[in-house]
């Protein structure tokens, strides 16, 4: 299974660039780790992929928070993926998201918030932040992620 991972699409232009949609159209699933700002982002993603899941982020308005969960646990084959946004100081994000999923027995934790990519294995858990798709406030580049799950997990960051 090939999973496209995006986060932090909040910016002055709330549309996902066509080139990014094109690169994500062959995914089996797309996960958005929050800070959508507008639900039309999900409509764009659903136009290219049937299986789209998302959580709300700290910048999302109440209308989005009413429609999306704060966290999800998704099973793909024999692997469990935790999806959340995160909050607070970026230096402590991994600890925070670990605590959010401490009783969920996950193999991967996908999160956003920091705007810079993380692809790091600690113990038995892969921590994956795709970076921001549209905002370079805290990173020198925009990015998204691809996670491939077969017998193993392979994850990579794609710089835009």
Where are these regions (language model features)?
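N-terminal active-site segment of His-dependent metallophosphoesterases
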Residues: 1-47, 51, 60-69, 78-80, ...
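Active-site environment of divalent metal-dependent phosphoester hydrolases
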Residues: 11-15, 37-41, 59-65, 88-93, ...
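Beta-strand-turn-beta hairpins that frame and shape the catalytic cleft
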Residues: 1-3, 73-82, 121-127, 149-156
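Residue-level detector of beta-strand structural context in well-folded domains
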Residues: 71-72, 117, 145
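Active-site-proximal segments of metal-dependent phosphoesterases and phosphodiesterases across multiple
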Residues: 60-105, 135-138
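Short, positively charged, low-complexity/disordered linker segments
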Residues: 98-120, 126
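Binuclear metal-dependent phosphoesterase catalytic core
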Residues: 77, 104-106, 128-160
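Active-site neighborhood of phospho(di)ester-bond hydrolases with catalytic His/Asp-centered motifs
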Residues: 5-7, 29-35, 53-58, 83-85, ...
